[in-house]
């Protein structure tokens, strides 16, 4: 092994260690913010991005990285001179949205070299997620809805909406990876989705489970299975609607109907369509080729729309939007033969159009990327048993850490 190859191998090992701590760092950031201290998530992820870029020895990957960071640099130069743009927020959100393509490019390369590490990353981060939510159940951390009702649990994670999307992506990984007990896995994730208490955390898991079952049985039995599932889930939803958190959601819907004068679109989107109209009016008033191509950043006098699809276009312009949109279309294309992952990608895309903290969510980026990589066989043939041989793999954190310390300290 050459000296250069040894350095790259140790660098990949260090990145692997950082990825094992992915959710733990977000959890620490939430804890620090509750205490009024600055978080550690942003510098950690900036370091992770830099190391992944340095580690990648791929011409195509380098071109893609150059494209994203070239556009980001041009955007930031313009935003610096805009009086109506928050430069720091624009930079922070840019780094969040490019996390998914950077992770995807790096992990796709690692899938050819060290795919067994992926399962350890999923296991460890899932454990952190569950332990955190259980601690929230015991009264530690914050609530999903920080008001007088204090309903929902998010533990020490800072953003309930981002946490809901992350739970959904991790659920998709486990239901497709686990060799058995898929119904039990679904019940466990539904339980934790209920603890979080958002529409996304509960209904994304429910809807995916219904569609997963529908496509997992023979065509002859599909509609019978669908009927049974809808019947069981209707009973479950009825029970859920009697709980305080969903009673709160019902009262909130009634309040929104009154606020928006019976406009069901506004109620469904929690008024985000009105924010979309306001941003569109500002866009029309200040339109120029420069804003069309590079956007106007995150406005310092108006909150974001929280519809990621539209926020990306208005904030960062057509060129950057096409890059991000192209990435998600590529993920959909390469997994087109795998109906279960295609369903996930379509639901994920639908969430980005109807809600926020999906594309602009660096927390879920890792698990979205893994879901779109681990079921591929060289990008052509779907191999659904790709992880069957890994079910007995134990954690090698201790031996990996010993090797890293021995060679570097």
Role assignments for model-derived ranges:
Residues 1-253, 284-290, 302-409:
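Hydrophobic transmembrane helix bundles of membrane-integrated enzymes that assemble
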Residues 262-303, 319-320:
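TM-adjacent membrane-interface loops and short helices in multi-pass inner/ER membrane proteins
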Residues 246-266, 295:
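Flexible internal linker/loop segments at domain or repeat junctions
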């Amino acid at each position: 092994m050459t000296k250069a190859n040894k350095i790259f191998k140790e660098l990949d090992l260090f990145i692997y260690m950082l990825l094992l701590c992915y959710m733990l760092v977000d959890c620490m950031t939430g804890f620090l913010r509750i205490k009024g201290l600055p978080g550690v998530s942003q510098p950690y992820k900036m370091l992770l991005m830099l190391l992944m870029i340095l580690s990648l020895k791929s011409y195509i990957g380098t071109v893609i990285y150059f494209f994203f960071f070239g556009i980001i640099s041009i955007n930031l130069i313009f935003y610096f001179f805009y009086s109506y743009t928050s430069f720091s927020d624009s930079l922070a959100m840019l780094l969040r949205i490019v996390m998914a393509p950077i992770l995807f490019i790096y992990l796709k390369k690692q899938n050819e070299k060290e795919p067994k590490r992926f399962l350890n990353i999923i296991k460890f981060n899932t454990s952190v997620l569950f332990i955190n939510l259980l601690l929230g159940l015991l009264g530690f951390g914050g609530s999903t809805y920080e008001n007088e009702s204090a309903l929902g649990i998010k533990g020490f994670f800072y953003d309930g909406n981002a946490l809901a999307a992350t739970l959904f992506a991790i659920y998709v990984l486990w239901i497709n990876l686990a060799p058995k007990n898929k119904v039990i896995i679904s019940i466990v994730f539904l339980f934790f989705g209920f603890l979080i208490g958002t529409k996304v955390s509960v209904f994304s898991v429910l809807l995916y489970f219904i569609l997963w079952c529908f496509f997992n049985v023979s065509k002859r039995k599909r509609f019978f299975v669908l009927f049974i599932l809808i019947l069981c889930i209707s009973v479950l939803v009825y029970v859920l609607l009697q709980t305080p958190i969903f009673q709160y959601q019902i009262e909130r819907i009634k309040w929104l109907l009154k606020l928006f004068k019976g406009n069901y679109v506004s109620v469904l989107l929690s008024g985000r369509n009105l924010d979309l109209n306001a941003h569109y009016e500002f866009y029309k008033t200040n339109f120029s080729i420069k804003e069309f191509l590079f956007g106007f950043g995150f406005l310092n006098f108006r909150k974001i729309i929280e519809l990621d699809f539209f926020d990306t276009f208005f904030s960062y312009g057509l060129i950057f939007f096409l890059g991000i949109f192209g990435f998600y279309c590529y993920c959909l294309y390469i997994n087109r033969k795998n109906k279960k992952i295609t369903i996930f990608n379509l639901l994920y895309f639908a969430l980005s159009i109807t809600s926020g903290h999906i594309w602009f969510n660096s927390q879920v980026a890792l698990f979205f990327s893994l879901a779109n990589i681990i079921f591929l066989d060289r990008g052509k043939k779907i191999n659904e048993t790709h992880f069957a041989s890994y079910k007995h793999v134990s954690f090698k954190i201790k031996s990996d850490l010993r090797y890293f310390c021995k060679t570097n300290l």
